[in-house]
């Protein structure tokens, strides 16, 4: 009898059920700062204590996380959504680097590659994070570059490195030794049994410190010349992308076999864009444009709006089956249609985000998972004709040939590591109404360091494909941004901020963010309950990394998933694997307008958490 009651309990809607969390909700009234490293959250707190706004604090936290190699470096990329309380609008910061001169389909194929490489100088897009940080600060912040870089510069002078990063360096030391400047920075004990720093050891990055000092020096000189705060920050930006720093990045990259030239850095610009959005049951959800995977979450919400998720019950077999298939449909479109909208052809986003198109896609969801689900044709829903109609029929054939499917023994560690690779998040909010959500990434360990700059280069070229049958919108060419997994999120309700949320984890990001959002909106969880709740991950989409594998029907569930749920999912055609955790750390801020306060949440593992006041 007890088992029957338990089964009923677990499939009931979550409403009214109290859940004990391992971490407490973070409460604040004046400001909140949440990110992937405690020291980086402290950097944000320092800026808030000096009178900075949420953008100033986010920039300081971004600088600190990049300095601490929290799955990113200064040569990586930054994506941000910012709510501006003055204009009452959400804006998007596109600081994704692009493909350098010579980075073409023919070039990579001539190197014997099926995809651009995972690591090394040929994996590098141009640095985006410095430009993204300085643009956000100049346009929406209040403080100087010197002030917001001060914590990062102190860290570069030496900080006690944490075990996670220290061990990551040690585990990747053979790859690091291939690149002389990386070896110099990362392996202070070269020749000893352990060549990486030990946990707690003071990790010094003198070259990076000097690079940051040059930016501050340039800002100071501009201010002495009666330049405005904004002009002085952009002068520093100019030095990074067109001055001596750029020259050393190019020299050091080319010395190690890379493609950068000086015009690649000089011509790259940050873009301030209109985000994409859909309305889900009265909540406007904002994501970056289709050069990210962000719209896949919006497509999933449109599809799921056609189902009564609450009545299915939180993480019931029916719920998991429905959400899994909705994600599969959205990600099949991602894999074929998404790409840099600055290049032709442009992705059919109007059709892809159409509610009518979502109804058509929702009609494909059945009681059994379809492992062969492919992209749809959104062009009729925006009054157009699909220029790649002929490729839709061959898409599934190409994927089947290139990918062997799920191995009998289940998902292996290397595959999961690739699928969930990299990234961190930065979430800030203040009493004035500014809200920032960032998912910076790129340049994770093992990274190629560009000459004597201390700047680790991105590895994001690998997210391009070389076969138009896989995605005709995402083929590499100079100046083009790859379709990346990075995906900050903001939600608005009744014209006011409702939720800022982001997560690390590669292709799993928008899957976990979707479930987190539904946990709050459909099942009435608070922000911490939603962050700690069990998620599931699909591998039916193509990985954006490495060999771009696909595992049709594969699903990872948390290892405490009840046996009757496992049994039902097996009947529905799923190939299950079970892990202690199934999500990268989610960081989020929920806005309590009834009491005028912030509620912060972060997953109950990893180093992510925050500080508030």
Predicted regions span which residues?
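Bacterial Sec-dependent N-terminal signal peptides
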Residues: 1-20
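Active-site rim segments in enzyme catalytic domains, especially the processed small/beta chain
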Residues: 67-92, 109, 251, 256-261, ...
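Short Gly/Pro-enriched turn/cap motifs at secondary-structure boundaries
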Residues: 71, 122-123, 200, 275, ...
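Active-site Gly/Thr loop motif
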Residues: 259-281, 362, 367-417, 457-486, ...
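M16/insulysin-pitrilysin zinc metalloprotease superfamily fold
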Residues: 294-310, 491-499, 506-531
């Amino acid at each position: 009898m007890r088992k029957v009651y338990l089964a009923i309990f677990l499939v009931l809607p979550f409403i009214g059920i109290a859940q004990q969390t391992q971490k407490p909700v973070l409460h604040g009234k004046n400001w909140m700062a949440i990110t992937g490293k405690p020291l980086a959250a402290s950097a944000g707190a320092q800026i808030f204590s000096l009178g900075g706004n949420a953008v100033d604090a986010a920039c300081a936290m971004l600088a600190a996380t990049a300095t601490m190699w929290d799955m990113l470096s200064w040569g990586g990329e930054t994506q941000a959504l910012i709510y501006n309380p003055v204009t009452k609008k959400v804006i998007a910061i596109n600081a994704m680097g692009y493909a350098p001169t010579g980075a073409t389909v023919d070039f990579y194929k001539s190197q014997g590659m099926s995809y651009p490489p995972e690591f090394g100088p040929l994996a590098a897009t141009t640095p985006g994070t410095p430009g993204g940080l300085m643009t956000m600060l100049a346009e929406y912040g209040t403080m100087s570059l010197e002030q917001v870089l001060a914590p990062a510069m102190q860290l570069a002078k030496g900080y006690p490195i944490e075990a996670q990063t220290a061990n990551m360096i040690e585990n990747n030391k053979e790859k690091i030794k291939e690149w002389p400047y990386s070896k110099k920075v990362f392996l202070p004990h070269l020749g000893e049994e352990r060549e990486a720093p030990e946990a707690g050891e003071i990790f010094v990055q003198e070259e990076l410190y000097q690079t940051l000092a040059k930016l501050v020096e340039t800002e100071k000189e501009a201010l002495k010349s009666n330049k405005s705060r904004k002009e002085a920050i952009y002068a520093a930006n100019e030095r990074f992308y067109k001055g001596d720093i750029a020259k050393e990045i190019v020299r050091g990259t080319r010395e190690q076999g890379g493609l950068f030239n000086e015009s690649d850095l000089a011509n790259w610009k940050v873009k301030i864009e209109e985000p994409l959005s859909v309305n889900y049951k009265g909540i406007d959800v904002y994501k970056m444009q289709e050069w990210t995977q962000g719209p896949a979450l919006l497509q999933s919400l449109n599809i799921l709006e056609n189902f009564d998720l609450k009545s299915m019950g939180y993480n019931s077999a029916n719920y998991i089956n429905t959400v899994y298939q909705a994600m599969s449909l959205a990600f099949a479109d991602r894999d074929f249609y998404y790409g840099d909208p600055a290049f032709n052809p442009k992705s059919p986003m109007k059709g892809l985000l159409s509610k009518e198109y979502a109804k058509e896609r929702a009609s494909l969801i059945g009681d059994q998972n379809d492992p062969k689900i492919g992209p749809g044709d959104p062009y009729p829903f925006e009054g157009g004709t699909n220029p790649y109609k002929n490729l839709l029929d061959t898409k599934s054939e190409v994927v089947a040939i290139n990918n062997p499917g799920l191995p009998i023994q289940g998902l292996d560690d290397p595959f999961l590591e690739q699928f969930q690779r990299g990234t961190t998040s930065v979430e800030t909010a203040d009493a004035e109404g500014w809200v920032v959500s960032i998912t910076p990434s790129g340049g994770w360990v093992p990274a190629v360091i560009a000459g004597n700059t201390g700047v680790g280069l991105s590895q994001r070229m690998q997210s391009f494909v070389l076969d138009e049958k896989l995605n005709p919108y995402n083929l590499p060419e100079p100046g083009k941004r790859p379709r990346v997994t990075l995906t900050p999120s903001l939600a608005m309700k009744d014209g006011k901020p409702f939720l800022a949320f982001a997560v690390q984890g590669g292709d799993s990001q928008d899957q976990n963010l979707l479930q987190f959002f539904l946990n709050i909106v459909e099942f009435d969880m608070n922000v911490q309950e939603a962050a700690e709740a069990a998620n599931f991950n699909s591998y039916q989409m193509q990985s954006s990394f490495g060999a771009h594998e696909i595992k049709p029907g594969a699903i990872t569930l948390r290892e405490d998933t009840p046996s009757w749920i496992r049994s039902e999912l097996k009947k529905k055609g799923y190939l299950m694997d079970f892990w202690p955790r199934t999500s990268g750390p989610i960081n989020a801020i929920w806005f309590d307008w009834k009491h005028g306060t912030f509620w912060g949440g972060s997953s109950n593992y990893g180093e992510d958490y925050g500080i508030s006041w």
